[in-house]
Structure formats: structure tokens, C-alpha cells
């Protein structure tokens, strides 16, 4: 009899795998299911994407309880682990450790916390201040999260924003080492350069002290094999499903508005039957046959 591997264990194994692993952004239950069907072994619960699909800015305008509600639907809709983009932890150590417990309750496999101040500013904003948290305070926040988890395989990823904030390699390395020593299961090293030079410098200096996660949204032209050669553990494709859906909705809506007709869009969009399939409507039909009276 085979034993199903817990989602938390799956994520931990991915972070510590010798192979380069990939996880894909999702922002609701439907997109989570699509990501799984595509073959991805894990899901990134993007803060930007979850905020955007709620119609608010990526500045903690959506409360942590609203985000967790979305993540519950995503977890229910998929069998692969979800790593939540948990921003700064929605406050101090106490908010962050409470978040961890609530994520565990909902079957989320891990949380990624960034070392900036609450409320956060999206890392890809140009010309916006990116104040960093005190190193010791953030390291203790990581420790509080690790101490509060009940599942030993629940993963805490510490996201270092030193390069984003304009600091150099020494600061990035100092922060990464502090967070690793505090118990972080992996370090996410972020950069918004159009080339991977920040990541290259960090990986060389880091010297395989622990798993490293990257988000190549800005340096997307870099061949994936280069990340393998550097020793990166995991790549996050961070917001592309949300961006693709916005493009599709804009085009479809404009076409219908201009044409006052559905003729030119019907063959470009999925059928209602496909939506039913993604919702696993067949399971409900079978359940109705089994549990509803026949007359």
C-alpha cells in the first residue's frame, strides 16, 4: 500500500533536490488546477497576482485573512505543494507565526517572507523606496515562524531584498547567512537587473551553504541551463498566468464591445464544457447518482 507524500514534504524535497526545480504562479483555485495539469510539481502563491485578482494593489491592501482564504481554495483545487508569497509576514513576528499556523491548517506547504517593512512595496516598482528590515529583527521573525510550525516539513523561505534596495553583495550575503542561521529552509535572492549578474555574484560567494531560489522575471532571457550551472535550487515563474489572463480578458472584452457580437471570439476561448471539466463537475454528477434518491 503506497503512502501519499505530504505537500510539505514534497516542497522540502524540491528545495533540497539535486535537480533544478520549477514552480509556477497561480492566483485562485482554477489557475492552481491548470498549473498542476500542465505538469508543474509546485505552485507559487504570488502576492502580486492574488492582490491583482482581488482588484487591489500589492501593498498589503488585501489582509492576510483574505489572502489565506484564496490560498485555501487553491490548496483544495490542487494536489501539489503551494509556496505562499507571504510578503513581510503581515506585521511583526507574532503576525508571521500566526500566519504559519493558519497556512498549515489549510494545507499550504510553505511561506516566503521578505526582509522589508510592512506594508511592503512591490520589488519591481521603479523609483520607489525599498526600506529593509533590521537584520536581527527579521532573523528572529524567521525563528519565530520555524518555532511555531507543527509540521517539521513546513518550509520557510527567507527572501533577501538587498539588491532590490540598492545594496551590494556584502549586504546580501550578510542577510542570507543570518536568515539561514535562524532556520530558513532556503534563501530567495531577488534582483531586478536585466541580467543575472547579481545572482551570479551571490551564488559564487554563497558557496552552497543552502538551497537558493530565484525569480528571473527581469532577467528572463537568461538560459535556464545557466541557473543549473550556478547551482540554483528552484526557479519561480512568478506572475505570468495573471499577466496572460489580463491580456486575454482585455482582448476578448474589447472585441465583444466593438462588435456587439460573440461571433469573432467564440472560437478563441475555451468551451463551457472545459470549464466544467476544470471544476471536476464529473465528480459531482457521480456523487449525485450515489447519494441522491433515484425518484
UniProtKB/Swiss-Prot annotation:
Record field: catalytic activity: phosphoenolpyruvate + H(+) = 3-phosphonopyruvate
Assembly, per entry: Homotetramer.
Outcome after substituting residue 58 to A/S: Abolishes enzyme activity
Effect of residue 159 to A: Strongly reduces enzyme activity
Job of this protein: Formation of a carbon-phosphorus bond by converting phosphoenolpyruvate (PEP) to phosphonopyruvate (P-Pyr).
Active site: 58
GO molecular function: metal ion binding; phosphoenolpyruvate mutase activity
UniProt record similarity statement: Belongs to the isocitrate lyase/PEP mutase superfamily. PEP mutase family.
Gene Ontology terms describing biological process: organic phosphonate biosynthetic process
Alphabetically ordered keywords of this record: Isomerase, Magnesium, Metal-binding
Coiled-coil positions: none
Species the sequence originates in: Mytilus edulis (Blue mussel)
PANTHER family per record: PHOSPHOENOLPYRUVATE CARBOXYLASE, PHOSPHOENOLPYRUVATE PHOSPHOMUTASE
Name of this protein: Phosphoenolpyruvate phosphomutase
Signal peptide: none
SUPFAM superfamilies found in the cross-reference section: Phosphoenolpyruvate/pyruvate domain
Binding-site residues, Mg(2+): 58
Amino acid at each position: 500500500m503506497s503512502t501519499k507524500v505530504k505537500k510539505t514534504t514534497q516542497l522540502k524535497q524540491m528545495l533540497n533536490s539535486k535537480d533544478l526545480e520549477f514552480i509556477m504562479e497561480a492566483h485562485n483555485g482554477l489557475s492552481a488546477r491548470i498549473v498542476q495539469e500542465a505538469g508543474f510539481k509546485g505552485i507559487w502563491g504570488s502576492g502580486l497576482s492574488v492582490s491583482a485578482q482581488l482588484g487591489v494593489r500589492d501593498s498589503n491592501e488585501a489582509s492576510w485573512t483574505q489572502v489565506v482564504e484564496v490560498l485555501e481554495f487553491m490548496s483544495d483545487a490542487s494536489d501539489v505543494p503551494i509556496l505562499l508569497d507571504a510578503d513581510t509576514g503581515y506585521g511583526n513576528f507574532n503576525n508571521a507565526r500566526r500566519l504559519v499556523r493558519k497556512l498549515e491548517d489549510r494545507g499550504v506547504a510553505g511561506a516566503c517572507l521578505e526582509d522589508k517593512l510592512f506594508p511592503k512595496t512591490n520589488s519591481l516598482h521603479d523609483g520607489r523606496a525599498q526600506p529593509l528590515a533590521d537584520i536581527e529583527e527579521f532573523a528572529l521573525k524567521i525563528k519565530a515562524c520555524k518555532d511555531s510550525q507543527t509540521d517539521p516539513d513546513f518550509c520557510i523561505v527567507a527572501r533577501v531584498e538587498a539588491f532590490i534596495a540598492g545594496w551590494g553583495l556584502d549586504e546580501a550575503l550578510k542577510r542570507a547567512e543570518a536568515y539561514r542561521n535562524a532556520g530558513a529552509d532556503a534563501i530567495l535572492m531577488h534582483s531586478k537587473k536585466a541580467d543575472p549578474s547579481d545572482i551570479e555574484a551571490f551564488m559564487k560567494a554563497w558557496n552552497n551553504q543552502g538551497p537558493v531560489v530565484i525569480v528571473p522575471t527581469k532577467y528572463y532571457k537568461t538560459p535556464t541551463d545557466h541557473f543549473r550551472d550556478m547551482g540554483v535550487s528552484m526557479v519561480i515563474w512568478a506572475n505570468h498566468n495573471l499577466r496572460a489572463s489580463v491580456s486575454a480578458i482585455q482582448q476578448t472584452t474589447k472585441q465583444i464591445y466593438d462588435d456587439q457580437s460573440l461571433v469573432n471570439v467564440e472560437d478563441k476561448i475555451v468551451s463551457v464544457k472545459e470549464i466544467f471539466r476544470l471544476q471536476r463537475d464529473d465528480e459531482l454528477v457521480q456523487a449525485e447518482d450515489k447519494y441522491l434518491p433515484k425518484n
